[in-house]
């Protein structure tokens, strides 16, 4: 079966992937993130245990980890100094972490210490990194889509810089679910 249209057509391959033989693996939780690495490995971030599943392009499971991410949501693949990393958000625990492809944590971003969160919920949904290898400065942007409908900016070391609620533009945000940086033009 072919799905999609025009130049974005794909062949659907039934039972392409081998799911881990665990109760939650067979159930396969909600999947919010899928990325493809430079080596054509498919990384899936889902609300099951384990949360990260990595498959080769033949559908064989080659790695799994991330048992702590019950609220798996945002998955972003970035490249830093020639190495690929994953940004992960957990909507339940509020965790935002950067890991290598094997799950080793290399950076953690905490909820901003702003008065707004003394009474309001924080539930991050996505991360975008303004990658230095793509003419960026390394800044990290995080959406709080399922909490307070805010977007936070951090520098590359993880120091909080500012918060946007959308009123700076056309109107207040309503569940900013994800965000991406468009590198297709000279001025991203």
Positions of predicted regions on the chain:
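Beta-rich, blade/repeat-based domains predominating
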Residues: 24-39, 68-84, 114-139, 169-188
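Short loop/turn segments that connect beta-strands within beta-propeller blades
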Residues: 56-60, 100-104, 155-159
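Blade/loop signatures of beta-propeller domains
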Residues: 1-15
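Beta-propeller domains
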Residues: 9, 32-33, 37-39, 43-67
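Conserved beta-strand positions in repeat-built beta-propeller and related beta-rich domains
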Residues: 44-47, 86-92, 131, 142-145, ...
């Amino acid at each position: 079966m072919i799905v999609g249209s025009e130049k974005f057509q794909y062949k659907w391959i039934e039972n392409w992937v081998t799911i881990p033989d665990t109760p939650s693996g067979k159930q396969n939780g909600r999947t919010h993130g899928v990325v493809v690495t430079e080596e054509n490995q498919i990384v899936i971030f889902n609300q099951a245990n384990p949360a990260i599943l990595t498959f080769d392009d033949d559908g064989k499971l080659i790695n799994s980890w991330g048992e702590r991410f019950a609220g798996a949501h945002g998955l972003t693949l970035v490249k830093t100094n020639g190495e690929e990393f994953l940004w992960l958000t957990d909507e339940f625990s509020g965790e935002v972490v950067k890991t290598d492809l094997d799950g080793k944590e290399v950076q953690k971003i905490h909820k901003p210490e702003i008065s707004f969160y003394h009474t309001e919920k924080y539930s991050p949904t996505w991360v975008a990194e303004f990658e230095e290898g793509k003419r960026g400065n390394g800044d990290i942007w995080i959406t709080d889509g399922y909490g307070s409908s805010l977007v936070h900016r951090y520098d590359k070391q993880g120091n909080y810089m500012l918060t946007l609620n959308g009123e700076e533009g056309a109107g207040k945000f309503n569940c900013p679910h994800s965000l991406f940086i468009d590198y297709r033009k000279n001025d991203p």
